[in-house]
Regions:
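Short amphipathic alpha-helical segments
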Residues: 37-38, 62-63, 163-167
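Basic/polar N-terminal segments that are highly enriched at the extreme N-terminus
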Residues: 1-19
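Glycine-rich FAD pyrophosphate-binding loop
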Residues: 40-66
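Active-site acidic short loop of glycosyltransferases
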Residues: 18-21, 147-149, 176
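Glycine-rich dinucleotide-binding loop and its adjacent helix/turn
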Residues: 6, 10, 79-88, 93, ...
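Glycine-rich phosphate-binding loop and adjoining beta1-alpha1-beta2 segment
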Residues: 58, 62-79, 88-96
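Feature captures the FAD/FMN-dependent oxidoreductase FAD-binding
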Residues: 88-160
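N-terminal Rossmann-like FAD-binding beta1-loop-alpha1 element of flavoenzymes
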Residues: 20-50
């Protein structure tokens, strides 16, 4: 099968959809969104796609919505040079960061590049073909193979399938409410 950069096609012998791009970005959180904008700016002729496990951008800032969630870094540091943080509070809450990311996504027309509900199952490099093959599972259970010359991992460091449940001595004796950001 010939490499058809940017084209989606059905592979002849399987029921797996396939897509080829120059760069595949894994994760549509702050890192993935930032990489997409930099890629468009620095390499405008390169095709790219973003695979996002969830049905929304934002990563941490979308997943964790407990009361009082905020950045522990100022947004002048955490934000992007190409889209300076202009809000009054430098230590931003989660909803403000989500608004910032949505504004960037809209301004740079990134929506059409994002493949929502795609959980990456594997990534393998072929030296013979000089490209990556990434297999992802969609929310309906179907699978898609994506081929790319480069893969950028911006998926963060949380294990969404098995969040860490710290066993803290005496926690059960607490009279206050115990909150875990992933439970």
């Amino acid at each position: 099968m010939a490499n058809q950069t940017g084209a989606t096609r059905i592979m002849e012998k399987t029921n797996t959809a396939s897509e080829s791009v120059d760069v595949l970005i894994v994760g549509a959180g702050i890192s993935g969104i930032g990489m997409a904008v930099h890629l468009r700016d620095k390499c405008p002729g390169k095709s790219f796609a973003i695979v996002e496990r969830r049905d929304e951008i934002g990563g941490t800032w979308n997943l964790f919505q407990y009361p009082g969630i905020r950045s522990d870094s100022d947004m002048h540091t955490l934000g992007f040079k190409f889209e300076p943080w202009t809000e009054q509070k430098a230590i931003a809450d989660g909803p403000s960061i989500m608004n910032y990311l949505h504004r960037i996504k809209a301004k740079h027309d990134l929506e059409k590049h994002i493949r929502f509900d795609h959980k990456v199952l594997s990534a393998s490099w072929s030296s013979e073909e000089a490209r990556w093959t990434v297999t992802a599972e969609k929310s309906d259970g179907s699978r898609v193979e994506m081929h790319a010359n480069f893969v950028y991992m911006g998926a963060g460091y949380y294990d969404y399938d098995s969040p860490y449940d710290a066993q803290i001595e005496g926690l059960g004796n607490s009279k206050g409410e115990v909150v875990h950001p992933q439970f």
